Amino acid sequence: KEVVLPKTMKEIKRRAFSENHSLRAVHFPASLKTLGPKAYRDCTNLLRAVFAKDSECREIQEGAFDSCSKLKRLVLPDHVEVIGSKAFFRCKELKKVIFPDTLKVIEAEAFRFTGLEELNLPEGLVELGESAFFKCNNLKHVVIPESVDVIERWVFHGCNRLETVEIRHDPEYVGPWIVNKSCTIRCYKGSKMDAYCDEYELKREYIGAESVVNE
């Protein structure tokens, strides 16, 4: 079952299509401004969610696609600024998301337990919420944009295949245990992130140097 929503639709309300197991694809019109909480939660056969290129949607609200376990790829529209908590929680087949340059906040657990294989975060992103990418076990390398001021705890914790996280600046706040001990933080020597690695006994690799320091 494929649903093309009316071109005049502005809002999809809370749980509007939740637990609709026959839904395979949905097309969102440019007029859509609000994608409500848990709107498509537990649509376990949803394969595609397509936004119009000129979509006015600015926020993917809490749990909007929670447990859409067959959703594989997503292109978010240009005006999206916030991805709400658990928006894509347990989307186990979600391999790739293309983020817009307008994105400012990824809230808590937004992509927890997803199948993401790569992560290209946009410059302009300000905040990464708690456990935002917790147990995304297919991620290997991540670069944090220099615009990010807040990295909450456990952002990449439990990502067992994650090899490196590169942080080339000093965010205003970095919470505890953003990565596993098996992961290497790439940072500048003498930076706050260097001291953070000391505090949590994390491996680090200095940018511009060849050696890895193990504490």
What are these regions (language model features)?
Residues 18, 66, 89, 134, ...:
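A structural signal for leucine-rich repeat
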Residues 202:
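Short glycine/serine/threonine/alanine-rich loop segments
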Residues 13-16, 36-39, 61-64, 84-87, ...:
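Consensus positions within tandem repeat domains that build extended binding/scaffold surfaces
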